[in-house]
């Protein structure tokens, strides 16, 4: 039996999604909880391996098990064995041809910036603080050049192992909600650190250090050293993963926090 789960987590205290020796990971916690409920070893496959400190409201995983359990066991039962900062949001039995990573057609991230002179306290681990005033409208205009198929070498981490830097950005929007600025971006896939590198350069434009045209110039240069520093992990969320309709996976609010699905 193959089962898919929707997973939400606060990544602040984890060394990323992927299981590693001697450090805490989201994958290890989830597999341990699932193994207890299934009463057999469970290994999971995810839609996107988030980095250390990155969060998710829309991570999708699948696993194969011989255990027969009610849906409540895979949701509430698993949640009872998980730490408070990881939770199962939904469960669905899927066809054998489903794969959390390889069946996905697009992924969507939201990056939240707290744009205020003073740092936040309540949301300190869920946003990235920028004390400089930011012009969200300039950031929005600058980001539009990213739409479509492009070579994202300028926004690709040096250690990225992807075979190609080409990605197809389907949606990008920058909006302000009071003191919060949200960068919302959806693509067929992302190269390593792509969203955080894009946000780092948009911040330079937003605070007036660079012109609106700088983003397009960086894209054309295909040179990571010419772009801004990588933005912090704190404000980044994997909010949704798209799959072909015939898999009929549950749809839940993307968030995070106060954000509606149609915002951003």
UniProtKB/Swiss-Prot annotation:
Binding site for substrate: 109
Source domain of life: Bacteria
CDD domains linked to this entry: PseudoU_synth_EcTruA (cd02570)
Annotated Pfam families: PseudoU_synth_1
Record flagged with keyword Isomerase: yes
Enzyme class label: isomerase
One GO process term, biological-process aspect: tRNA pseudouridine synthesis
Active site: 51
Example of a GO MF term: RNA binding
Keywords: Isomerase, tRNA processing
Enzyme Commission numbers on file: 5.4.99.12
UniProt-listed InterPro entries: PsdUridine_synth_cat_dom_sf, PsdUridine_synth_TruA, PsdUridine_synth_TruA_a/b_dom, PsdUridine_synth_TruA_C, TruA/RsuA/RluB/E/F_N
Catalytic activity: uridine(38/39/40) in tRNA = pseudouridine(38/39/40) in tRNA
Function field: Formation of pseudouridine at positions 38, 39 and 40 in the anticodon stem and loop of transfer RNAs.
HAMAP family to which the protein is assigned, alphabetical: TruA
Subunit-level organization: Homodimer.
Family as reported in the entry's similarity comment: Belongs to the tRNA pseudouridine synthase TruA family.
Name of the protein this chain belongs to: tRNA pseudouridine synthase A
Native source species: Yersinia pestis
Gene responsible for this protein: truA
């Amino acid at each position: 039996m193959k089962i898919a789960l929707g997973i939400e987590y606060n990544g602040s205290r984890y060394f990323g999604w992927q299981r590693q020796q001697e450090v805490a990971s989201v994958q290890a916690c989830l597999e341990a909880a699932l193994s207890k409920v299934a009463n057999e070893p469970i290994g999971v496959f995810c839609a996107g391996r988030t980095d250390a400190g990155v969060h998710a409201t829309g991570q999708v995983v699948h696993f194969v098990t011989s255990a027969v359990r009610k849906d409540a066991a895979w949701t509430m039962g698993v949640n009872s064995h998980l730490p408070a900062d990881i939770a199962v949001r939904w469960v669905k039995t899927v066809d054998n041809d489903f794969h959390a990573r390889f069946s996905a057609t697009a992924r969507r991230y939201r990056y939240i910036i707290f744009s205020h002179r003073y740092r936040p306290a309540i949301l300190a681990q869920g946003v990235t603080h920028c004390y400089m005033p930011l012009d969200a409208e300039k950031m929005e205009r600058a980001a539009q050049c990213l739409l479509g198929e492009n070579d994202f070498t300028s926004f690709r981490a040096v250690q990225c192992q992807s075979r190609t830097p080409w990605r197809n950005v389907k949606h990008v929007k920058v909006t302000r909600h009071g003191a919060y600025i949200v960068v919302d971006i959806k693509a067929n896939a992302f190269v390593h650190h792509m969203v955080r590198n894009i946000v780092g350069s948009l911040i330079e434009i937003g605070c007036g250090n660079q012109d609106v045209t700088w983003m397009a110039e960086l894209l054309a240069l295909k040179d990571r050293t010419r772009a801004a520093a990588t933005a912090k992990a704190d404000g980044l969320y994997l909010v949704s993963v798209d799959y072909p309709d015939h898999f009929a996976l549950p749809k839940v609010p993307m968030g995070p926090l106060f954000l509606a699905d149609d915002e951003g």
